[in-house]
Swiss-Prot record:
InterPro entries: 4-PPantetheinyl_Trfase_dom (IPR008278), 4-PPantetheinyl_Trfase_dom_sf (IPR037143), ACPS (IPR002582), Ppantetheine-prot_Trfase_dom (IPR004568)
Reaction equation(s) it catalyzes: apo-[ACP] + CoA = holo-[ACP] + adenosine 3',5'-bisphosphate + H(+)
Keywords: Cytoplasm, Fatty acid biosynthesis, Fatty acid metabolism, Lipid biosynthesis, Lipid metabolism, Magnesium, Metal-binding, Transferase
GO CC entries: cytoplasm
NCBIfam families, A to Z: acpS, pantethn_trn
Species name: Rhodopseudomonas palustris (strain HaA2)
Cofactor: Mg(2+)
Chain's role: Transfers the 4'-phosphopantetheine moiety from coenzyme A to a Ser of acyl-carrier-protein.
Protein name: Holo-[acyl-carrier-protein] synthase
Amino acid sequence: MIIGIGSDLIDITRIAKVIDRHGERFLDRIFTETEQARAGRRDKQPNLVAATYAKRFAAKEACSKALGTGIRQGVWWRDMGVVNQRGGRPTMLLTGGARARLDALTPPGMTAQIDLSITDEWPLAQAFVVISAIPAATSGT
């Protein structure tokens, strides 16, 4: 059963400009340490760094929409992090207010599953999030 869907499209150059202007202050406010480490491994190619951050920014926006709150009502940027499963498939790891909202949306006896798709084609990055409730006994995440 689908309990939330969200999508977001962002201009990668917008994220690059914000990073240039605000640097670590912006990165620390929006991105988890795991996300920053992943982008840091691409530091030899500035366009890849910006695209990496833009995809994760779009994923957070899409996730907040799937949660039905946007970035408010106790759901903050760093409560949502893009992590990779074995094999590289991205998903969202929720903490704090985002986790509380997810738990509130998930019906009793069910487990939430978050499916994430992220992509980029310069100068755009895009993310889709689908949150499903699946029977607890068959949950994969």
